[in-house]
Amino acid sequence: MGKTIADILERNNIPYMITFGTLLGAVRHKGFIPWDDDFDMFLFDESYDKAMEALSRELPSDMFLETKDSEPLYFHGFSHVKDIKTVTACAQFPHDGLYEHKGLSIDLYRAVRMDEGLLDKYLITEHIAYLGRRFRINSIDKNVYEAKVKELETQLHDLQIKETGKELLAMALAERSMKIEHVFPLKKISFEDTEFYGPADADGLLTAFYGDYMQLPTVEHRVPHYDNVIFIEAQ
């Protein structure tokens, strides 16, 4: 799936990079982390819509582009590509089970370039919007929703916003941001038997994300994303 998506993006001159556990796997394991079956990509805000158009047009029939336009119960702040030949279960993220398509998923995160002084405002605003989408589809209790939104609106009101002139890359709902110099210029990095685009400074980015990222986690923290995967035979 990842190779198919990357081929479409590269053919349409749309920048992307592997990130999070996928990037960590590429550097530390030269591919998938043995206990991690997830796949993560960053797309960039200025070309995100173009990427969705290209994927919608060119993905094969056994993959589904899950967006706010194609999934009625959509609540994420980013899109996914789902494998329709599989069905998964994930106790860690039970709300994902609300979606019609429950197959293996590739996350297409949206990286937004902004002044670092605007980061907190952006993250709080996006969190409020996320809770609103969850509330709209009845996946969050009304009292919990109202209490969380009130708390976030108070934080937003109390912010001291001052632009610094220094830019970074942010992602909605993530506690991490990325330094521009860690990301650009993008460069190819090996993953299993394929090369994907990754950041300019993978070591710097992974250190910022995870600290001593070459140190393996303890056995109890080696938890797969999916609890179960069922492969559907072709009809």
Where are these regions (language model features)?
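Conserved catalytic core of two-metal-ion nucleotidyltransferases
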Residues: M1-N12, L55-E116, I137-F209, L216-Q235
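Active-site nucleotide-donor binding segment shared across nucleotidyl transfer reactions
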Residues: A6-F39, Y48
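Short hydrophobic/aromatic beta-strand micro-patches
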Residues: F42-F44
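Short, conserved charged micro-motifs
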Residues: D49-E53
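A short secondary-structure junction signal
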Residues: G117-L123
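C-terminal, low-complexity/hydrophilic appendages and adjacent surface loops
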Residues: L123-I124, E181
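A contiguous, mid-domain pocket- or channel-lining segment that forms the substrate-recognition surface
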Residues: H127-I128
